[in-house]
Amino acid sequence: MDEIYLNWDKMFDEAFRIPIHEIKNDNIVFSGIGGSGIVGEIANILGVELSFKRKFTGKESLIAVSYSGTTSETINDVENAVKAGSEVIIITSGGILEKLAKEKSLKLIKIPSGFQTRYAFPYLFTPLIKMTTKRRGIKINEMELKEGVIEAKEQIKADATRLAELLINRIPVIYSSKYLAIAKRFKQEINENAKHPAFYGEIPEINHNEIESYVHGPSLVSVIVESSEIDKITEDVLNSIVIKPYFNSDEKNISSLLALAGVTSLEMAKKLNEKPDKLYNIPKARQLTSNLFKIN
């Protein structure tokens, strides 16, 4: 299964060809949850300034991302934005959101279906970053997203094996400053693929509180996704495992480090004899949330 992440370069190739829409407003609000939601936080690494305050006045553009098209929280945001008269752009592979887009003549970006959401990052992220950087007037080299996976592929395999050995049967807490969203994604991948506890936190905030928890937290293991000089303070204090970015380019680091997170979590799943695609608790939570929002 490691190949799912290591073949992201091919998925990026396909994603580059997905048609996008123009964003009308400067106030860009993002809605998404889980594997669909993290793409907005990662996009902000590249300076696109997405807002996550989902109160709609009609003067903003909502970009709603749900791979399945059935995420209750995102559907609710779309309905509220439509009522307010906001511009709505939907990125999805189908489901209720595709139906809503067609019924209400909303802007729709249809992406390939048939994957677990967390495996489909290139399809979710590429249209989002192309639209938002264009609106913000930010120049990025989108081909570097593909190149990051290709150029780091062998190192990713080796590092994932090493990390899985270090993290298994401990509780990893993944920290970063600039790359906080990547740390969060590491945590999510370990949770969902390996069914293993993991948490994340933001540097420098944790240097003022959380680092004291290691006094009585022998099962915790600190992991730093290094992104600035201040990260090294936490590394020194907690004797952390360090994940060093492979490149100087944010675009290459985003794709390669997220691929590393995915492959590491799959290696942990193997050691725990877990099936990455099997879900124990999430389906029940989804159904209860759907009931709460009265989504059919």
UniProtKB/Swiss-Prot annotation:
GO terms for biological process: carbohydrate derivative metabolic process; carbohydrate metabolic process. The keyword Isomerase applies. SUPFAM superfamilies: SIS domain. It is an enzyme of class 5 (isomerase). One of its GO terms (molecular function) is carbohydrate derivative binding. Involved in the synthesis of UDP-N-acetylgalactosamine (UDP-GalNAc). Catalyzes the conversion of glucosamine-6-phosphate (GlcN-6-P) to galactosamine-6-phosphate (GalN-6-P). This is D-glucosamine-6-phosphate 4-epimerase. It comes from Saccharolobus solfataricus (strain ATCC 35092 / DSM 1617 / JCM 11322 / P2). The lineage of its organism: Archaea, Thermoproteota, Thermoprotei, Sulfolobales, Sulfolobaceae.
